Amino acid sequence: MDFRLFLRQILRALAFLAPAIFLGGCLEYFTTVTPLTGINVYDANQVSQDERGIYSIAKDKIVKTKIQTKILGTSGLSNLNVDVESFYGDVYLIGVVPDAEHKEKLVELAKNTSGVNKIYTYIRFPKDGGECEGNLAIMLNLKNNLFKDSIISGTSVRVSVVQCNVVFTGIITDIEQEKHAIWYAKHITGVRDVYSFLKILKD
């Protein structure tokens, strides 16, 4: 993947974050630090390099969109603060919500979405955040490292950064891909913890 494509993806990421930047303190009142979710540098060539077939990708995209639409219509929940991923109908909810009640709402709306098999969560509350101002730096640093690694580059690995914690989701073909991703994350300044939902695709 060339530098121009990487630059375009970064500009997309910054455009996505613009509302959060302009809302400033108001948004941070609820989230402490807005998680970087929904930013995936592999979207541009996802279909050609994703380990899933086109049919499975399309089905997962529908599930993801349905859940995001429900989040949009639910008071206290925001797609800016919660990332939704779906792989073979297994749904991953990652981000920050105001409290346990809203976490329950989030899980319930995913449960009641057709096409969902299982639900996995990495949900934190504002009080869990502490001092964390490095989400963007962590994300860009990690993405840059993953791009350069021939073992990981071009896979469907997704990265979310929540309160300076790195969360991986996606489908991989080799355990070494997960090991490399985790190693990079653990060696980035400011990362508090690393959690992996990565699953190996079995033949």
Descriptions of predicted regions:
Residues 2-7, 11-15, 25-203:
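N-terminal targeting leaders
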